């Protein structure tokens, strides 16, 4: 199934394709503060479109292996990019940014990112 979403102001939009049955809630320092619910997909399953690249900002911390992208205009974090354990490019879509998402229907798995 295809899902569309964006930041709050619409400057950063995405289309993600896959089966969305469960997401990850992480308690690491950044996820805890952002409140993201993450859906992990391969880079082939996600298409990003930008109103202008000037509105896309990136934040990295700790080991600097995950690019946490956010909108400079509205401050929303719609997705992050990185690599999985096998070196494949992946996206972590914040499902809270998907249009008309009913979070009640999705299983939430909790991950102890503070201890990882």
Name each region found by the language model.
Residues 1-6, 11-116:
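A short Gly-Trp-Pro
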